[in-house]
């Protein structure tokens, strides 16, 4: 029947767009400058330094704190930790699944359905019926 076709699956397109967006956001965050602006429109000393002109003098030293952390490595550790937690959660969830084989005890052990595997487990001999 025309008109009863399944809808187009855009899952792969959304995955590619999400990966591209995350890649662009990651590159932007890693390359953006978050240091305070020091100097004027002509002279910039973002990493510290000295500048002396006829009427002005600028001394700016490298910003530091008692707890020096590199935020790039902090973000990397957060991403790796979250990835590890998600992976562990999926592995634990897969281990908790209950899988069972249903065997019809009312049918003959020869298998009355097409395929001949009704009442048998693949790779094993026939199971006794009660």
UniProtKB/Swiss-Prot annotation:
The keyword Transmembrane applies. GO terms for cellular component: host cell endoplasmic reticulum membrane; membrane. InterPro entries: Plant_vir_prot (IPR001896). The keyword Nucleotide-binding does not apply. It comes from the Viruses. The chain crosses the membrane at residues 13-30, 73-90. GO terms for biological process: transport of virus in host, cell to cell. Its main location: host cell. Residues 31-72 are lumenal. Residues 1-12, 91-130 are cytoplasmic. Keywords: Host endoplasmic reticulum, Host membrane, Membrane, Transmembrane, Transmembrane helix, Transport, Viral movement protein. Residues 110-130 are annotated as: Disordered. It is found in: Host endoplasmic reticulum membrane. Belongs to the Tymovirales TGBp2 protein family. Plays a role in viral cell-to-cell propagation, by facilitating genome transport to neighboring plant cells through plasmosdesmata,. TGBp1, TGBp2 and TGBp3 seem to act together for cell-to-cell propagation. TGBp1 is the main movement protein that physically cross the plasmodesma with the viral genome. TGBp2 and TGBp3 would facilitate TGBp1 function. This is Movement protein TGB2. It comes from Narcissus mosaic virus.
């Amino acid at each position: 029947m025309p008109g009863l076709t399944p809808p187009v699956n855009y899952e792969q397109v959304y995955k590619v767009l999400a990966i591209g967006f995350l890649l662009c956001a990651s590159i932007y965050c890693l390359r953006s400058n978050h240091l305070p602006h020091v100097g004027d429109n002509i002279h910039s000393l973002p990493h510290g330094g000295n500048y002396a002109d006829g009427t002005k003098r600028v001394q700016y030293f490298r910003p530091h704190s008692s707890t020096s952390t590199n935020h790039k490595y902090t973000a990397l550790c957060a991403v790796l930790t979250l990835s590890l937690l998600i992976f562990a959660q999926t592995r634990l969830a897969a281990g908790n699944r209950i899988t069972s084989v249903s065997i019809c005890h009312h049918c003959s052990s020869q298998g009355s359905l097409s395929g001949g595997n009704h009442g048998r487990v693949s790779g094993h001999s026939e199971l006794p019926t009660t």
